């Protein structure tokens, strides 16, 4: 499991974004969405690009058992499998 609540919330937000076929998930969009949600729930006002890239790396890996099929095409991140979710 993630080492802290903020990481778990970011994973959930990233998963929601990548699961949404109508959203073009660039790094900037993921940063914006994570910052917005975390500021609402946790009072965190900024999430760095490095943090999001590291989260994506962790979600792709088997380190925490996610092994998510995340692909990037021209800077847009998505799941390679339609309807995929790490929480569903």
Where is each model-derived feature located?
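Short, basic/aromatic recognition patches that contact phosphate-bearing ligands
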Residues: 1-88
